């Protein structure tokens, strides 16, 4: 087999066919690694592992060359990386295994050859992670369309306009049980083709752009660079790579690196799913694309009836501690009370580490030893992304905060006619699924908006939340702009100047579409719109120009999305990062309206008053307050809120 792969690689090189060369190089690496595993002579086995790793390096070098400059016009970088992700995983696994063998029996951080292998494996993992986001962040500061033929730019705009038109139709149709399924299927097919065409046009623009030719895109960081550029003496990185046979955890501080072997992907994913199913009541669970965690997709339920109580606490504690023991406990002695920067993988992307219980037992939510009680926790798509957004962040002056809340969802809401009276039905959770309509607490459908077919109830808690935060802002000497009712509109968000706000806070219903992440978004006023349909979708957020160091999305499931191999979770977080927000606050599931208002008010009080906490520290303190307060001590209420990106 090795001779065949060698001949195939030589032939591909001679014919200048890198697309055929990397599979041959990978085949050579796999064959040599398999041979080494069967070799009884330790010296020959070590030589076999080295030749296998060298072949993996060759394969990755070929893949990176294809990705950086010679992709076909009909192939997007993210799609290409997804198809080659296994090569990165196998190469990283080989190096990690060799590092662990070399370090066997040693205590403390890795040194010597073991550290060298672990560092190379880490960089390969970073190479395979969130690369499209890194590229987009690199391109965002450069006008790569300058000098590009006008016809090409027009094709791009026409394509985007049609995608937007179809998105508006499908968003409304997916919420309407009477929609024409055949018509929707045709539109879905057209949208798929438009998306493929758009990737082709983007690649043609890059090829035709003089600016792009001279643009140096951000490169994934080495382990030493992460220690120097990303971490501080109070922060530890936990980076996970889940593999078919084994998974790996890099625990990194400024002073050292440790590597741990974990169970394979399926085992870790199952533990994460088990915990998530304990965290989220059955009727509020969502099926996340690619990860089967759900039974149903009901929204707007009465939280008093659906939320967990202490009768479920023991089962939660068991599931939570089991996952903690698998993915955090191996590194616990290195962490102390450091801030944790978590770069997750697989189903770990859908579990808040704050909710992990560090010791088994217990049947009282308010008395459990949660990880959040000892550590601040922040998340990132990759360690390299943190470095890039940190370099690009421009801090606005002043203390301005923008608050967007309590939109008008229904045409017969009195506010739509200028009245101030509240509608009859309020929702208790902030979010909606694409498969079902919202009902009020009593189970009676809320008023319907004919244009969209959407049944959606008002969230009065978001108004209270925004007004309280505005008071806190003004009391601390800052300025708060607050958009309520019809002012909480898509047009205002898209057309007003948002660059001078230090915080942008949006409290409304979230719209999750895990199958098509570009349709995931925020629901703003659905009536009185002269432009737009009231849904601020992911693809529209990419076009915003933000200067706010913090964007807080106080809505349902804003941290969810589709996990694409090599990219992580694709959804609202990366859209807001691209738009200029280095830190994004999102939620992991459908959040309760009243408890969310309380948590957010407490969070801002700690940020804006004399305590002057960072957003990460304030969130942790607010969560601890909820745990101690007993009324909302179940993690269902406080754990879904996470911060992604910069923590400083």
PLM feature spans:
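Short coil/turn linkers that connect adjacent helices within long alpha-helical scaffolds
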Residues: 11-19, 65-66, 78
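Cysteine-dependent hydrolase recognition
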Residues: 383, 389-510, 556, 581
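Functional beta-strand-loop-alpha-helix junction segments that form "active/interaction loops"
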Residues: 214-225, 305-326, 449-519, 524-544, ...
